[in-house]
Every structure is written in C-alpha cells, then in structure tokens.
Amino acid sequence: AILRAIETCGKDNVYVVLVSDGLGVNVFKDEAYKNMTKEQKKEIRDKEFKAALRQLGVKEKNIILLSDIDKDSKNRFELMKKIILEFENNLKNVTHISHHYEYDDHPMHIKNGQVLKNLKDEGKVKDALYFMKPQYVKFIPEKNRVIYQVNDMSEYNKVKKACYEYKIVDIENGRHGVGYISAHSYFDNLLKSPNL
C-alpha cells in the first residue's frame, strides 16, 4: 500500500505514523536487553522502522512517531485520534490505513483499527482502509477487499529490502534485528509470495 500511495500521490504526500514505542516486544525480555533503558530500546526499534520506510521511499520528515510527540503517555490512542483528525482536516483527499479493528492477533493493532473505525463511523474521516494479516482475509467478503501487490521485480525488491532492515544485526550501529526476531514468521511468509 505504501508503494502504491507513493506512486499515486507522490513522496511528499505519504505519511506513516507509528503508534507504539515497541517496548512490549518479547525480545526485550531477553537477558541481553536487561540493562538497557526504555529510551535505548525505543531507539533500536525506531531505527529499524525508519530504515524500512526509507527503503520503501517514505521521506524521513513524513514518519511520525507518537512516542516522540508524547513521551509520557501510556495510552497513545487519543494522540492517534488527534493526528488522524489533523490529517483529515488539513490535507486534501486523505486515505487513512490502520490495522483491522477486529481481525488481528495483537490487541494494540485491534485498538488502532478501532480508533480509525470509530472516526469513520462518526463521519469524521472520509476514507479508511484496514491492513489485514493473510490468515484473516477470509473473513472479509471479496467485494470489500482492496489488495495491493507489487507490479514488478523493482517493487518486490523494495519490499524485500524493507523487510531485511528488520533483520540487520549490527550492534555497534544500534541495529539488533528486534523486528525480525520478534515476528520472523510474518516477514518469512510475506517474502515467500512473488506478488507480496
């Protein structure tokens, strides 16, 4: 969806918002991370997130980390709602994309989707789409599905490189591969498909 948005709207008009600080990932419970501060763990997570988005062509200034805006909040869903409404009111022709509000195996992803769905249901957001993990697509009628796939090897390689950013282990440069370690099956399964 990000590649298609950049192709359709241009790099200047594609924004990605990261809601969580990532401190809840299982890998951070390992002994190797025991003496790290929350800020150090967040920096590790943010570094690979931004690197992956750069591979897809997202401009650094268009990557919004809610945990940088509000470092103290334990619940960033109100801030997420505020950002969605700012986009909706200040930008033209916005399509918001979030995780699905019902079909996901992560409670925070579901909550993200519920925030967007509630705004859509209230008429405060005109266009909303929901990302779904492949195992849940069967629950959505075919006529309601929007499927984004790569068009060629160039796009496939961009997605592949973005996925590999989560796999890089280079401790001296703050790269620990936490995304891949935490959720390797998602990356592995995605890259098995030639169409992504």
Describe every region a protein language model picked out.
Residues 1-122:
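Active-site beta-strand->loop->alpha-helix modules in alpha/beta enzyme cores, enriched
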Residues 48-56, 60, 77, 122-196:
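The feature marks non-catalytic terminal segments
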